[in-house]
Amino acid sequence: MMAVTVSGNTGQSTAERLQCEFFLVKKKRQCGMTRRAGSQFCSEHSTDSDRVPCPLDPSHTVCLSKMRVHMRKCNKFRHDVSYQAKQREIPWFKEGLNSISNGKSDSKPADETLVKSVSLIQKIFQNEFGDEPPLPLIEKQNELLERTERYKTLVNRKHARQQSSLIQHLKESKLWPSLESCAVNKTLEYIELGCGRAEFSRYVNIATNLDQKEHSHEKPEYKAVAPSFTLIDRASQRLRFDNKFSSDIGTEVQIRREKIDIKDLRLDAVLHDASQYVAISKHLCGVATDLSLRCLLNSDKCKANLRGILIAMCCRHVCQSSEYVNQEYIKGLLKRQTDGSMAYSEFFQCLKKFCSYCTCGLRPDMDPNSGSEDHITKLTHNERQRIGHMARRIIDEGRAQFLQSKGFETVLFKYTDSAVTLEDTALLALRKHD
């Protein structure tokens, strides 16, 4: 930044505010900060040798003698979860434990690469899935949950409908606490990754309690035991539902929430001592799905006692080629193409780009068969969306096959109608029985 001083008298009256004389060229005005008497510039623009760029955010400078104090209150520190964890030396933090990234982020694919990828995606999809119909729509309803007063009074049931379907999938897949398991002290813990306000876990808690009450008259000798919950999110959430869990069902529920990036999470250090674990998430964003799968498989407790995983995935357009959990799968797809001269990272960037067209939607006045003349690929809105669904299926299939290689049975399906949400695909993984 160029410094241009504005002529002025540094010995002006103390009654008058001493304005910094540094001229901000880009903003075409003088700095508005106050300077000390006898100084030409404010502390930010001072040329004193004891000021250095802040280690957390080099866009501002810090006086060396005040560095320790500044590091505790710097705005960047408040948002840097990994740095906070490192400073606190918490046992569940291990930097980069679940990451395999080389530190490089994906770049936008070149126009010619994007155009070239269209035929490649179509060919790969045809070879892998042939004329196989789209993923099946298996929307379910948890009747007990939908009978509750809260559900009935909801005006917008968009999220509640999704939760009801996912919860019923958990129940029918036996990822659920039964009265029999409670009787032999087999405790169940749900791990919600990317939990946000923990609304999904809250309704899992309500539904399991209602189900146990419904069947308790059949087996009065068994006592219902609420599952425990571990909630993970890297952001600070307002209006969290954590304190509602116990009041919703009238009994104490074990809950633990930790603010940490999944890439740095040592899961064993935060889990309760349960007999079995189930990992869940509703709309786990982009690369977080890959980090979560790796996090679960890096856990010794989950290796032995993880019963299953149910993740409603979203935002494939913010996945990372370097973090994708099954790179060998996509490299293998490319290798089998005789005309495949595209590198893995390039192809993955194109997959991400096309995935974004799955969730764009159209304004009511737009023709889905138009838009080809304005787009580099010369594809209409409908055609781009169709290629996007192919790209999304390829990314999701790689994740499913990764879990299969680790001893799980997997299924991909649409858990709700696309009119409810365009991010309508879920991955269910169940531990194979020996």
Swiss-Prot record:
Q: Which residues bind Zn(2+) per the record?
A: C54, H60, H70, C74
Q: Highest taxon of the source?
A: Eukaryota
GO BP term, example: tRNA methylation
Q: Which family does it belong to?
A: Belongs to the methyltransferase TRM13 family.
Q: Zinc finger regions (CHHC U11-48K-type), where?
A: 51-78
Q: What does this protein do?
A: tRNA methylase which 2'-O-methylates cytidine(4) in tRNA(Pro) and tRNA(Gly)(GCC), and adenosine(4) in tRNA(His).
What GO terms are given for molecular function?
tRNA 2'-O-methyltransferase activity; zinc ion binding
Q: Which gene encodes it?
A: TRM13
EC number(s) from the headed UniProt entry = 2.1.1.225
Pfam families of this UniProt entry? TRM13, zf-TRM13_CCCH, zf-U11-48K
Q: Which UniProt keywords apply?
A: Cytoplasm, Metal-binding, Methyltransferase, Nucleus, S-adenosyl-L-methionine, Transferase, tRNA processing, Zinc, Zinc-finger
Q: Which InterPro entries match?
A: Methyltransferase_TRM13 (IPR007871), Trm13 (IPR039044), TRM13/UPF0224_CHHC_Znf_dom (IPR022776), Znf_CCCH-type_TRM13 (IPR021721)
Q: Which PROSITE patterns match?
A: ZF_CHHC_U11_48K
Record keyword DNA damage present: no
Gene Ontology CC annotations of this record: cytoplasm; nucleolus
Q: Quote the PANTHER family the UniProt record gives.
A: TRNA:M(4)X MODIFICATION ENZYME TRM13 HOMOLOG
Q: What is this protein called?
A: tRNA:m(4)X modification enzyme TRM13
